[in-house]
Swiss-Prot record:
Species, as recorded: Streptococcus pyogenes serotype M4 (strain MGAS10750)
Compartment list: Cytoplasm
Keywords from the UniProt entry: Chaperone, Cytoplasm, Disulfide bond, Redox-active center, Zinc
Stored InterPro entries: Heat_shock_Hsp33 (IPR000397), Heat_shock_Hsp33_C (IPR016154), Heat_shock_Hsp33_N (IPR016153)
Function, in words: Redox regulated molecular chaperone. Protects both thermally unfolding and oxidatively damaged proteins from irreversible aggregation. Plays an important role in the bacterial defense system toward oxidative stress.
GO annotations of cellular component type: cytoplasm
GO molecular function: protein folding chaperone; unfolded protein binding
This protein's record includes keyword NAD: no
Lineage of source species: Bacteria, Bacillati, Bacillota, Bacilli, Lactobacillales
Similarity comment text for this entry: Belongs to the HSP33 family.
Pfam family, one: HSP33
GO biological process, one term: protein refolding
Protein name per Swiss-Prot or TrEMBL: 33 kDa chaperonin
Main location: cytoplasm
Maturation and modification: Under oxidizing conditions two disulfide bonds are formed involving the reactive cysteines. Under reducing conditions zinc is bound to the reactive cysteines and the protein is inactive.
Amino acid sequence: MDKIIKSIAQSGAFRAYVLDSTETVALAQEKHNTLSSSTVALGRTLIANQILAANQKGDSKITVKVIGDSSFGHIISVADTKGHVKGYIQNTGVDIKKTATGEVLVGPFMGNGHFVTIIDYGTGNPYASTTPLITGEIGEDFAYYLTESEQTPSAIGLNVLLDENDKVKVAGGFMVQVLPGASEEEIARYEKRLQEMPAISHLLASKNHVDALLEAIYGDEPYKRLSEEPLSFQCDCSRERFEAALMTLPKADLQAMIDEDKGAEIVCQFCGTKYQFNESDLEALINDKA
């Protein structure tokens, strides 16, 4: 089961989140049938949103959009504070690797664009923020957003490793944040440790990558685990929701679906579930609008 572990240095100077998001990203790949680069780009976006959602309280919903002028198109993710996330990538078929090593490439092909976040607190006044893509690798772009928009200097690492068949092998990441009151000495010590950390891909390849991440972040520094919470890919689409969307269409449009297509098929962008509405269903909607 996927999870996020929240922890804090005993000194109170820093906190860290570490995530195992393997099942989340594997299910996203399965639902969208993504190729290698698209899988990694979508997976990193989902993990970033899982981190962002874990930072919120109440029943907030968080939307993350990675919008670039690239082969990937837009990447959209929506998460809640209960550990659920969903998402999709416009172009599922991007498959770009280094010839020599087989490394999956994302950043060099993301192009120019923006990292957009929308936090809906349920009050009718969502908070939106837009920051430019810095590298297109998504992790660095997320860290830049946290520093610029939330004024919280953060170290971010997130990645998706694929097997020889380009299926998700492991996915996860971490966030480390300085807390108010940290001394210059403590900040310098943690900056040095983060600079010396192995690459996120190396840590994820460890047998128990969650413990490996915590060990790399804290070293010999004493820390406390605050909580361990489940994570999952979960879409909240339903037939009723799409039926309500059809009800917003003019009668003439519904009648055209009956006359021309003998019904309608609606596919959820976030999970690929197909909903069929036959002629009788559409006629009932027309009658309900009368």
